[in-house]
């Protein structure tokens, strides 16, 4: 599969980096899924609109930050191109609009 694995945590990057393992990330994971090669378009559109910031562009991972208000509407209505989507509404409900999210995109090529 050529594409990306995207995960969204309800923590700023400096806090997300402290988490090790699935048990540690589970309470903060909002959603994760697999997409094809154009699957970062929505993130880059947020960056272009000034609603997200790209922190790293390495692919291992590429990292973005954005406020929940700008990302949650997107993930609450899953798109057909989001493969293997794991959606965690119980964690999403805990986010305020101002929560800073860490969005990691791992290159699957």
Where are these regions (language model features)?
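Short, hydrophobic/proline-enriched secondary-structure or compact coil segments at domain edges
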Residues: 101-105
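Acidic (Asp/Glu-rich) sequence patches and key acidic residues
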Residues: 1-97, 107-109
